[in-house]
Structures are given as C-alpha cells and as structure tokens.
Amino acid sequence: MSEYKDTLNLPETGFPMRGNLANREPEMLKRWYKEDLYGEIRKAKKGKKSFVLHDGPPYANGDIHIGHALNKILKDIIIKSKTLSGFDAPYIPGWDCHGLPIELMVEKKVGKPGQKVTAAEFREKCREYAAGQVEGQKESFKRLGIMGEWDKPYRTMDFATEANIIRALGKIASKGHLLKGFKPVHWCTDCGSALAEAEVEYKDKVSPSIDVRFKAADEAALLSKFELTEGHEGQGDISIVIWTTTPWTLPANRAVCLRDDLEYVLIQTEGDNAERIIVAAELAKDVMDRAGIEHFHNLGFAKGADLELSQFQHPFYDFTVPAILGDHVTTDSGTGVVHTAPGHGQEDFAVGNKYNLEVANPVGSNGVYLPDTELFAGQHVFKANDAVVEVLKEKGALLHHHAYEHSYPHCWRHKTPIIFRATPQWFVSMDQAGLRAKALESIKNVEWMPEWGQSRIEGMIEGRPEWCISRQRTWGVPIALFVHKETAELHPNTLELIEKVAKLVEEKGIQAWWDVDAAELLGADADQYEKVLDTLDVWFDSGVTHFSVVDAREEYNGNSADLYLEGSDQHRGWFQSSLISSIAMKDEAPYKQVLTHGFVVDGHGRKMSKSIGNVVAPKDVTNKLGADILRLWVASTDYTGEVAVSDEILKRSADAYRRIRNTARFFLANLSGFNPETDIVPVEEMVALDRWAVGRALAAQEEIVKAYEEYNTHGVTQRLMQFCSIEMGSFYLDVIKDRQYTAKRGGNAQRSCQTALYYIVEALVRWMAPIMSFTADEIWNEMPGQRDKFVFTGEWFDGLFGLAEGEELNNEFWTEIQAVRGAVNKLLEDARKEKTIGGALQAEVTLFADDALAAKINKLEDELRFVLLTSAAKVKPLGEKTDAAQATDIEGLFVEVAAAEGEKCDRCWHHTPDVGTIEGHEKICGRCVSNVDGEGEVRKFA
C-alpha cells in the first residue's frame, strides 16, 4: 500500500475536527473587531432595502442571564439572515438606564440623595454606575457573537436620548393626551412627602381589625341576584360585610370589591337580632366565628359577577357605593369583600379607575383629616381609628372589632407608620383624545407572531387604566413642564419650552432641568408658574425609543421598525408602552411585526432559581462549550413556548454541532488541491450523482431561506441537520469516498465530485452563518478560491442548480436507489454478523428484481457497485432468483450476498479478478492502474 499511498487523493485541511470553541472563539472575536466586521457589513449593504429590528433595552443592572442570551441571539440570527437576504439591517443595541434598581445600588454606596450627597451628585453617581453596568453586559453580549453598533449603542441616559424623551413628552402633550390626576403613593406624614418604594421599611404594627356592614340600598334588587335555596328570602336587614385593618380610610370608601368567580353566600342569622349577611362562601364560617354568631344558616348563593354594580349604603355617610369586581380579591383572610378607597391604595386606585370611581383624599400632607371631612375633621388619621370604630358602633355598622398584629409599611427616616395617599400625578390618557380606540385599530395592522399575541394585547389595551407616567424619583428623565400655581394648567407655550429644555438637556443631561432658573425660560411669567419635579416612568423612556432612537439615528435612514422581538411578558410592558406612545405621537404603530419568545425553564419545566440550583449562566456555557453551542441551542428550540435548557439539553446541541462540523470538515478536506478558477467542471460534464447532490442543496437552500424569512430557526436547524446527516452523510458522502480518494488526480471523476462539494459548501457555510457564526467564519477562511473577507458581507449562494428537466436520473430515481441501497445494507450487515464477509468490499451482491425495478437499477450500469459500496454487483431477472437470495423490504427485490471473487486491491481495497494480472502493478486492480498511470476511469453515474 505504501508505494501507492501518494497516488491517492487523501483528504487534507487545516479545519480541525474538534471545535475547541471556548478557546478559539475569543481569538476570532479579536479579529472581527480589529478588522471591523460590523463596519464591513454596513459598507457592503449600503443602499440596499432596509430592515429594522429595534432592540428592546435590557435594564443596565447585573450580569446577563440565559433569557438575555436567548433574546439577543435570536435577534442576531434574524439580523444576519436578513443581511444574507440582501437587506441593509443595522443593529443598534440599547440599554434602559434610569429608575429605582440603579438608585438602590447607588444608595448602598453613597447614601440617599439629600443626606451625604446632593441630588445632583447622586444623579451623577447613578450615571456612572449605569455606564459601568452597560459595559459589563456589552462584553457578555459580544462574547455570544452578537454583531452590532457596540461602540455607539443607545442608552436612555445619553444626553441626546434624554432630550428626545422630553421632546416625546411634549408631542404627546400637544396632541391632547396628557392628563393630570391623582394616584395613591406611599406618604410619610412626618416628612410631609411621598416616599419611593426604596424608602419604605416593613415592621410589625398593631391595628384595629374590623368587620363592617354596608347595608343593601335596594334589598329586592339584590335578592333577585341570588339563587335562594330555602324557598324564602329570610328576615332582617341585608348587609355585605368588608374587613379592614385601616378604619381611618373608611371616609374615603367609594366601593366594595368582589371577585367575579367567587361564590358569595347570603347568610340568615338566628335569634332576636336576626339579620342577613353577605360574605364569600369559603370564608363564611370564619366570619361567623369571629363575630361570635353561633346560629345561622344559608339562604342562597350568587357569583361575584352577578352582584356587580349592586348598591350599598356607606356605613356613616349619606351616599351609596357600588359593588365592583377585582382580581386582587382573595379568600386568604377577611370576608372575600374588599373595602375600596381609591385615594388610599394602589389596587383600590387601579380597580377604581376601571369603574371611574372618585379618588377621594380627605387627608392632608400632615396626616390630618381636611377641614371639610365630615365627623373627623382635624384629627390625625392614626388617632382617628378609635373615633371611626365608635361611629361604626353608633351606626350599627360594626359587626366585629379586635386588635390585630401585622406587617405594615414604615418611613425609613422616622420609623413611623406611613399611609397611602392620593397625590397629583401625570397620566397619558387612554380616552381623552381617543388614544385607546386608535391603538386598538392599529393593532389589526400589525403581524403578531404567534397569532395569540394580538388578542392578548387587545385585551390589555381594552382594559387598561390611564398610564401614570410620573414618579417621585431622583434618577430619571424629568417631566419638564411648567404648571400655573393657581389653575394647575400647563404653560400655553409648553411645546416651545419643551424644545428649549431639550436643547439644554442635549448639552448637559437631565441635571439641566433642576439647575435651570424658571426665569431663564419664562421671563416675566416665572412667578406664576412652578416646575414639575417628578420624573418619568422608565417604561416611558423605553416606550418612546421608536422616536428617541429609531427616528433619530442616521443608521436607520428614516425607516421605522419592521420588527420588535422580546419575551411574551412584554405585551404588558414594552410592546404596550411603545404602541401607546407611538399612537399618541404619530397615530401609527411603531412596528410592523411583533415576535415573542417564551421564558427559559430547566429540563423539568421549572423556572430558573438560585435556591433550586438550576440556573444556567451564559458565561458558564461559553467558557465550557462555546458560544456556537449556545447559539445552536437557541436556534433549535421552538421558542414560541417555554424554552428548556439543562446540561443534558446543551449536550444534545453539542452532539448536533459535531455532526454539522464533521460534515463541513469532510467538504473542506476533500477540496484540497481544488481551485474554483480553473477546476470547475461544467454542469453537463458532471457525474449524475454530483448533479443530484447540488440539486438537493438547492432544495434545502430554498426551504432554509424560507424558514429564516419566517423567523423559524427551529425549521432551519432541522433542515440543516437532515441535509448534513441524511442526504449527505448517510448517502452522498458515503458513496463518493471511493471516487474522491482513488480517482485520477485532476481527472473529471474527481473534479466533478469536488465541483459539487465546492458548490455545496459555498451554500452550507451561508446557511450556518446566522446561527453558528464562529464556525461559519472558520469554514469560510478554509475554503478555496477568491472571496470576501467575511461570509457575513455576502448573500445566499446563487451558484446552485437543480436537475435539468427530463433528466433520466431524477430525484425520484435517486430516492428509489437509496431505498435499494438500504435494503442491501441490511443483508450485508447480516452477512458480516454471520462472518460470510468481513466488510462490504469483500462482498459481491446479485439483485433479483422485477422488470420495472431492474430497468431502473440497470441505468447505473457497472457503477451500481460504487453506490452499494461492494466490490461487485449484478442485476438479474426476478424469475432467476436462487435459493440463497433473500427477500427485502422492497417488493419485487431479492438479494444474494456472496464473498467477492479475486484478490484485494492494495490501493482501493476492492476485490477484483484482475488483481495480480497486470505486469508492473501486481498488487492493484485495473481501475487503479488506469487512475495511476493511464487517463483515469470514466464515471457517468456515481
């Protein structure tokens, strides 16, 4: 063999079998950034049709988690596939940089604003902290192979973006969508000010626990809603009973709240003071025990939904309140009926908003009831608790009263109990100027993927309250408005003033608003107006990025976003805040398509949790397996539902990766010595099987590109695996090894094969590029021929071709041949087990086939043996089958396996009768002699 080894076309490549991705990828990244890969893509795509995927900004705090990786990798796959489809698809990553979590982290380091540091210094520290967090996350995303404007991302704290956020507020105000209203906030009566969530501590407190009767305003109407089980209506007053530990809020009560699906019971108490009481059926016994009522029975039942809008008498004021429905009502404790004071609770406020309840706030900033508060004027709320209880007793409204110890919010400064108190807040109104209706209409013009996203966001928009956009925080974009001190009206020149403030912020950042003297902007009007010192909800910051970023960045050339892609929780979040703000500003949706992915869970479907110990960190995966494995995991999942990840699942991704890598390596190794400039074989001169293989690649490419266009990465990876493992690995590559290794070097038989391999790998590397970006780049650099520096700057390979119309050896033919080959292989395997033969090349097979099948198989002539990987193969009529012939799974086909005649050729390992008969080449067969010394064998079919 050694004397003929140099005559073989042995595979040779610098592309290693082992990916060693964890070590190799960082080196590739260095090259990408040194040679400005992203800049090269932008240059190559300049002037092409635009595709804009707008990045929803992650929060600039903490390390990235596996959900971040899933999201960013999906975006990167889509961007890269669009680039290969000929689009100019820039990617500008973003970060959400204002808000409470950053404030909390900074407070730990420098204390609260106004203590050791001024508010201005505190904001600067927040800016520094957020900038550091962005840099950390940025490096993590880059390690995943995400390409984008990393040197010029958008950050909501960039001066230009902050200025544009303020401009967005001005536009919304100018369109009539801004509204000033009231909303309950944490309020310290000792500070006389609102508290942020961070300024609230929880400690145990003893409060009065009371069950209070609200009498039915119309007993007959109320009874008609119950299904009476006793055959009579009972006797005594009818009351619905609420439970509360804040009696002082009862003057502000404006409703009783039930849950629609809870069952409520009408109870008849027995004895001298018989009455009828309504509570949740599940809690009835607890309520009766608490009230010391031993003798009672049930009169009837009704669902909460049936009792909606029933009217009840306020326990001590002369007005009625409705029964309303809310999801926050539970049966954990109480009566299943919640006292609702929209001015004194966030849930009360939210549910009250849906029913347009009055937001009554009878309490001043010092915690004292206002002078016009009937019965309790001038009393401090906590001292008034006893007074409220006494009034309830006098009115006969108190069912039960006892002391109750519970966890209660306290001021972090004064260590005293706080209250919820409605204070003026700014809202984007959903109905004042028709915003809700326009938003609902615009939803129909957006493509929602999955489709259920449409009904989900429609339901949310239909039912949502006004959007409260104001916050009493330090680190945030200011609500840069001036309001009249007496009328509370906005300044008539608000839009012009907004632009002036925006220009200041562009130059100096948000601190400019707190620094600027009102007289600088308002002149003589300054004394009549006051600055709004609230900041904007961070959802406003990110929600208006369609304007502050997409409209503003030159990379987008004035194009609006084609696609928003985030987790399914963003129907409630970013998708919604973006939609509302865009409709408010532009009367159109900010996106054409919205695609959502599910949450990442472990292999058992559980959420990621440090306590369970099932957290998979992206950094751990890239350090161990490499980013391409993580990217392949993302692409291989059906991300529309929950996405499972575990060590076992990642191992499966690594196995799939190895199969794809080995396929690519086979292509590259067998293209050794091939120059596309000089060695390409014309289509009509190619071996039939090679033409078929290129045609299969074309069919695969059409399906893969379509799957990419539909954002179906799961479909891409499935088709890619099928092509590599089945069409190539199990058939084509297996068959061509003999020809590729043993054919005359540079002859048509070898070059035809290499031409096919070259065309296919040109396509394959592009299919891989959006998903396995590092590996695709590695393959690209090992491929023969002149080419661009990077695979990512090009487009899908257009050199593939299908089989010509009328081709005799068509796709159907090769499908049948593969079936025949499979049937023969089974019998060869049996013969191996029985030791009739060693390997397939020690066998010769005789196929006894019916006329139709024989006619097809015979089209391969003497090359049938190369397809079957045997040393000899004959086809005979079915009627001549021998006793040794065995049936196969194919009707009309029997096969006889026998040991091949002749000696083994030292070069190709085939057993043929002519080995040892050729002078000068006694150890090799005639075919090999031709390939070594002659013109080379001729192959037409395989």
UniProtKB/Swiss-Prot annotation:
GO MF term set: aminoacyl-tRNA deacylase activity; ATP binding; isoleucine-tRNA ligase activity; tRNA binding; zinc ion binding
Keywords: Aminoacyl-tRNA synthetase, ATP-binding, Cytoplasm, Ligase, Metal-binding, Nucleotide-binding, Protein biosynthesis, Zinc
GO process annotations (BP): isoleucyl-tRNA aminoacylation
PANTHER family: ISOLEUCINE--TRNA LIGASE, MITOCHONDRIAL, SOLEUCYL-TRNA SYNTHETASE
Family (UniProt): Belongs to the class-I aminoacyl-tRNA synthetase family. IleS type 1 subfamily.
Role, per record: Catalyzes the attachment of isoleucine to tRNA(Ile). As IleRS can inadvertently accommodate and process structurally similar amino acids such as valine, to avoid such errors it has two additional distinct tRNA(Ile)-dependent editing activities. One activity is designated as 'pretransfer' editing and involves the hydrolysis of activated Val-AMP. The other activity is designated 'posttransfer' editing and involves deacylation of mischarged Val-tRNA(Ile).
Name this polypeptide is given: Isoleucine--tRNA ligase
Lineage: Bacteria, Pseudomonadati, Pseudomonadota, Gammaproteobacteria, Vibrionales
Gene it is expressed from: ileS
